[in-house]
Amino acid sequence: MAHKSHRHKALQAQLEAQPTISLISQKTRKPPAPSMDVDQDDDVLISTNAASAPNTTDPSDAPVSATTTSSGFAPLTAAAQSTVLKNEFRRIPIPPHRMTPLKRDWVNLYTPMVEMLGLQVRMNPQRKAVELKTSGHTVDSGAIQKGADFVKAYALGFDVNDALALLRLDDLYLDSFEIKDVKTLHGDHLARAIGRIAGEGGKVKFSIENASRTRIVLADTHIHILGSVQNIKIARDAVVSLILGSPPGKVYAHLKAVGARMKQRF
């Protein structure tokens, strides 16, 4: 009996040591509350909004300093620009028949390029050309192009004072074409077309120049027009009409009508 009681006590001690399992608690256990998932979703949404929100501390939105450009580099100084432009060089060929007028008007030709543009100018009689080069006094990056256009206009036959407008104004251009570009003419027909453009004593040419506010050079079969884009078109249309055979009176009437429209517009 003592042995049985001792064994019973050992079994009872083992049962007390093991955790009790309640079937009722397992059946009645509630599922986890969805509030945690909602909180997690809220956390995700908040983090998404935070990620999509603009970054106010973006360095690109910071104001650009006055001493730097948008690219982050400081602008070049006038001295630095002059060092960049010092190697630019142009050589403008001069036709043989314009070499004598070039020597006569040389002072009036190179003075504005030196004083206004700061260029170095040299006449090269061997090459029959005028050479231009930028210097430390050249400030404008387009100065050498203006000088080249000025010399080219003089080489085509324009007067120095007329060509000087290319240096003072920015909206002037040169337009050149040949009579054969409009109509193929030969012999007396070509001579009559040139005569219609020039007129007696150059009256027709002067009338076109005054009406269109341009300057025209008639060099054999080549026609050169100096002026703004709109005025060049007016003068070119008048010259083309004369080449195609229109009488000068009809061209005059058309120029007057165009001039009246221009005055009303401006």
From Swiss-Prot:
A GO CC term assigned to this protein in UniProt: nucleolus
Assembly behavior: Component of the small ribosomal subunit, ribosomal RNA processing complex (SSU RRP complex).
Physiological role: Required for small ribosomal subunit (SSU) synthesis. Has a role in the processing of early nucleolar and late cytoplasmic pre-RNA species.
InterPro entries from the UniProt entry: KH-I_PNO1_first, KH_dom_type_1_sf, KH_PNO1_2nd
Signal peptide: none
Keyword RNA-binding among record annotations: yes
Keywords: Cytoplasm, Nucleus, Ribosome biogenesis, RNA-binding
Location(s) in or outside the cell: Cytoplasm; Nucleus, Nucleolus
Keyword presence, Cell division: no
Protein name from the UniProt record: Pre-rRNA-processing protein PNO1
Region of interest called Disordered, as start-end residue ranges on this chain: 1-40, 50-69
Domain KH: 190-239
Positions with biased composition (Polar residues): 15-26
Family annotation (SUPFAM superfamilies): Eukaryotic type KH-domain (KH-domain type I) (SSF54791)
The family this protein is said to belong to: Belongs to the PNO1 family.
GO BP terms, alphabetized: endonucleolytic cleavage in ITS1 to separate SSU-rRNA from 5.8S rRNA and LSU-rRNA from tricistronic rRNA transcript (SSU-rRNA, 5.8S rRNA, LSU-rRNA); endonucleolytic cleavage to generate mature 5'-end of SSU-rRNA from (SSU-rRNA, 5.8S rRNA, LSU-rRNA); proteasome assembly; ribosomal small subunit export from nucleus; ribosome assembly
Single GO MF annotation: rRNA primary transcript binding
Primary site of residence: cytoplasm
Listed Basic residues bias regions: 1-10
